[in-house]
Amino acid sequence: MQPVLFRTLSLGVAIAAASSSAFAATLDGGAVAAPDEYGAKVAAQILKAGGNAVDAAVATAFTLAVTYPEAGNIGGGGFMTLYMDGKPYFLDYREVAPKAASKTMYLDDKGEVIENLSLVGAKAAGVPGTVMGLWEAHKRFGKLPWSELLTPAIGYAQKGFKVADKQFQYRQDAVALFNGKTNFGDYFGHMKAGEAFLQPDLAKTLERIADKGPDEFYKGHTADLLVAQMQQDKGLITHQDLADYKVRWREPMRVDWQGNTLYTAPLPSSGGIALAQLLGIKENRAADFKGVELNSARYIHLLAEIEKRVFADRADYLGDPDFSKVPVARLTDPAYLKQRAAEVNPTAISPTEKVRPGLEPHQTTHFSIVDADGNAVSNTYTLNWDFGSGVVVKGAGFLLNDEMDDFSAKPGVANAFGVVGSDANAIEPGKRMLSSMSPSIVTRDGKVSLVVGTPGGSRIFTSIFQVLNNIYDFHLPLEKAVAAQRVHHQLLPKDTIYYDAYAPLAGKVAEELKAMGYTLEDQGWNMGDIQAIRVDGKALETASDPRGRGVGLVVKP
């Protein structure tokens, strides 16, 4: 059986229009890179109708909740990085722990983690944020009427969409995992490859949200259905949890490098801090990379040396900034990055046990959008695993997340991605769980030049890091930069480098890495699903990762 995975969707859009902004960018048309053909078509449709980047993002997110149910959602949460009228913004609509959650809720009487309790079933679900997040983004920046943006998704739910072969395989794996544990099979058991899949209950839910806005989801009939499902399945989410949910507008993480500015996710995502550290440490070791061939054994070793230090810091320090004091400034300080860079061994593996925190003590979906005014949206949202917790809200037709696994159920014990955490990411009521989602926007001279994101759990920021290297250091065309081999190392398991079947480590490179002492492992799923748009003057370029089933389109005015 194929492993059930964590998925992320990615989409990018741009369109030409008149603008009065000082950061205006009149483009040759629009563009979209989305994780499936339906999301791409809807984004293009909204742009042609005069919608802006946020309008296209909202419509695409709701569409993917229908056509990409393994990750697209209204029962999960996410992050959105925006660049509007020359100013960066970050919207945190991550799920939160229910009020009844506790630090020991996934432990047995002996204090050990109960297998799969934080991954499968109603108790794995955090309070969803997607509907409120999309509403708040639209309320602040949208142009087209809210109800119009849900119309395409409602149509696909009512009339169906053609199930892709790969999507059907994910469904098969999920049925095996959830069999007898959730009601997943009642809703998705009749899905067949190549045939239309209809979701009438979900269509009615989306119609109610289109008509009444987020109050329908958090306080209306949909909320009643969700709470009834929780009570039936012994979950924790209550009416009060839903009514109290709020998004957070935060200052985006900013990284300046090579004349570019990267805007990406701040805490409670680890991705922004990680990207700042990865880029900063690499810059301090520039001499080691000089003349080194892309994805050679030496190049991969240098990446592993940097990545293991970033993951050591992630495990010890990072969590929800509303609950824990996180030393962000110190972790990204140039002097600290120089110190960490000095620890890198360019020729041999640094012993894992000596790589400590440097200070004193799946499935996810992403889309990216750029409009003619130079505005951009980079959005990542998720259910965590493929099809989340496997629990479908009866009568409402949507899946609930299993994001509670992103907390540290027990400090020092790995989650489903093999990533460990500390008390900074321990479970507390109302707390946002740590994430790796890293929706990113690159600007140069105040104008958007790249919008990029990917799924992949702990592989998200290492994948984006490698794509940035491919573009800015190796000067690869966007499609080749996205398609190139990617690898991953995260400190633990010890001296292990992961690859995927799309671009396996083999031949001379593999032998050289093994000779250095590395263990090479096929992780069993794709190393991300990058969706990217590049803006060069007026020209638009899209790239949809060949590892997935995404589509890139240029939209002419």
UniProtKB/Swiss-Prot annotation:
Annotated GO MF terms: glutathione hydrolase activity; leukotriene C4 gamma-glutamyl transferase activity
Originating gene: ggt
InterPro entries with a match to the protein in the record: GGT_bact, GGT_CS, GGT_lsub_C, GGT_peptidase, GGT_ssub, Ntn_hydrolases_N
Catalytic residues as annotated in Swiss-Prot or TrEMBL: 364
EC number in record: 3.4.19.13, 2.3.2.2
GO aspect biological process, one term: glutathione biosynthetic process
Domain of life: Bacteria
UniProt-annotated location(s): Periplasm
Protein's recorded name: Glutathione hydrolase proenzyme
Keywords in alphabetical order: Acyltransferase, Glutathione biosynthesis, Hydrolase, Periplasm, Protease, Signal, Transferase, Zymogen
Organism (species): Pseudomonas aeruginosa (strain ATCC 15692 / DSM 22644 / CIP 104116 / JCM 14847 / LMG 12228 / 1C / PRS 101 / PAO1)
